[in-house]
């Protein structure tokens, strides 16, 4: 999965997919009542990027729905996975469940069109703080209460704070999650980070009894780092330059080992060599 980083304006969806992304990451900020408010990152952000592009959250969802609904004039067949980077740092811990409920209602209405031919992309809820695990239950309970448990098939999870793998496992246990787990590891492109924790996550994924299904590394803009991440066995690479990742995947060393995921590839299934 080539994951376009910080796609917060509707116009950027096309831009990143046209460069080769089959997945995008979108920032979601919350107001003081735990309502998802904007798709917005703000300053500081990655080097070389405009940090200030934004939409109202529900407007972005409608644009995203158009881009991921077959038959729509804006439809992009390649776009199959969306990671919502939930900026829950502005919330109190006791608001996490509420944030999940409100997020679910927004997605149900504006993205999934109340289950009536809505957007088809797989969705990952990416939460920075393991203490905010009640967000997951708030979200999943709401989908069930609203009569759409089938949409849980489209839903995956990520704790993005680079916490110890064991602590993340505990948070999932508390949240009642087993499966559909992406594990992120990374740092802003302005800084360097080694692959120690990525390798640990990959080992958990491949152990047969770990909690992780997929591993992605962020934010990768250089060919050398892309090669290192692929060599470590990641499933996804988040990038500001999808064309760089595409170029590396076309190199002889990687062409036979990797391909770009399509809608038919289940993002919740651990890949077996």
Swiss-Prot record:
Residues binding Mg(2+): 25, 27, 85
Gene3D superfamilies: Phosphatidylinositol (PI) phosphodiesterase
Reactions accelerated catalytically: an N-(acyl)-sphingosylphosphocholine = an N-(acyl)-sphingosyl-1,3-cyclic phosphate + choline; an N-(acyl)-sphingosylphosphoethanolamine = an N-(acyl)-sphingosyl-1,3-cyclic phosphate + ethanolamine; a 1-acyl-sn-glycero-3-phosphocholine = a 1-acyl-sn-glycero-2,3-cyclic phosphate + choline; a 1-acyl-sn-glycero-3-phosphoethanolamine = a 1-acyl-sn-glycero-2,3-cyclic phosphate + ethanolamine
Residues forming the catalytic site: 5, 41
Cofactors demanded by this protein: Mg(2+)
Example GO BP: killing of cells of another organism
UniProt enzyme class: lyase
Keyword Metal-binding: yes
Cofactor notes: Binds 1 Mg(2+) ion per subunit.
UniProt-recorded Gene Ontology molecular function terms: lyase activity; metal ion binding; phosphoric diester hydrolase activity; toxin activity
EC id: 4.6.1.-
Cystine residue pairs: 45-51, 47-190
InterPro entries per record: PLC-like_Pdiesterase_TIM-brl
Assigned keywords, A-Z: Cytolysis, Dermonecrotic toxin, Disulfide bond, Hemolysis, Lipid degradation, Lipid metabolism, Lyase, Magnesium, Metal-binding, Secreted, Toxin
Pfam families in the record: GDPD_2 (PF13653)
Expression tissues: Expressed by the venom gland.
Subcellular location: Secreted
GO cellular component annotations of the record: extracellular region
Function: Dermonecrotic toxins cleave the phosphodiester linkage between the phosphate and headgroup of certain phospholipids (sphingolipid and lysolipid substrates), forming an alcohol (often choline) and a cyclic phosphate. This toxin acts on sphingomyelin (SM). It may also act on ceramide phosphoethanolamine (CPE), lysophosphatidylcholine (LPC) and lysophosphatidylethanolamine (LPE), but not on lysophosphatidylserine (LPS), and lysophosphatidylglycerol (LPG). It acts by transphosphatidylation, releasing exclusively cyclic phosphate products as second products.
Similarity comment: Belongs to the arthropod phospholipase D family. Class II subfamily.
Protein name: Dermonecrotic toxin LhSicTox-alphaIA1ii
Organism whose genome encodes this protein: Loxosceles hirsuta (Recluse spider)
């Amino acid at each position: 999965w080539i994951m376009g980083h910080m796609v917060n304006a509707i116009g950027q969806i096309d831009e990143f997919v046209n460069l080769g992304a089959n997945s995008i990451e979108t920032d979601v900020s919350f107001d003081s009542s735990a309502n998802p408010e904007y798709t917005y990152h703000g300053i500081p952000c990655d080097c070389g990027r405009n940090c200030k592009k934004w939409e109202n959250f529900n407007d972005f969802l409608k644009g995203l729905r158009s881009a991921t609904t077959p038959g729509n004039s804006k439809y992009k067949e390649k776009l199959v996975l969306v990671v919502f980077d939930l900026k829950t740092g502005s919330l109190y811990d006791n608001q996490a469940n509420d944030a999940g409920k409100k997020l679910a209602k927004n997605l149900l209405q504006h993205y999934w069109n109340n289950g009536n031919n809505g957007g088809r992309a797989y969705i990952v809820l990416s939460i920075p703080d393991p203490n905010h695990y009640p967000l997951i239950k708030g979200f999943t309970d709401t989908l069930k209460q609203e009569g759409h448990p089938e949409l849980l098939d489209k839903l995956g999870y990520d704790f993005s704070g680079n916490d110890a793998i064991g602590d993340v496992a505990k948070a999932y246990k508390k949240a009642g999650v087993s499966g559909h787990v992406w594990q992120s590891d990374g740092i802003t492109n302005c800084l360097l980070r080694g692959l120690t924790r990525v390798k640990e996550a990959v080992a958990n994924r491949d152990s047969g009894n770990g909690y992780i299904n997929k591993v992605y590394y962020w934010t990768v803009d250089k060919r050398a780092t892309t090669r290192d991440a692929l060599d470590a066995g990641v499933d996804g690479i988040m990038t500001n330059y999808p064309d760089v990742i595409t170029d590396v995947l076309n190199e002889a060393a990687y062409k036979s080992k990797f391909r770009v995921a399509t809608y038919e590839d289940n993002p919740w299934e651990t890949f077996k060599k």
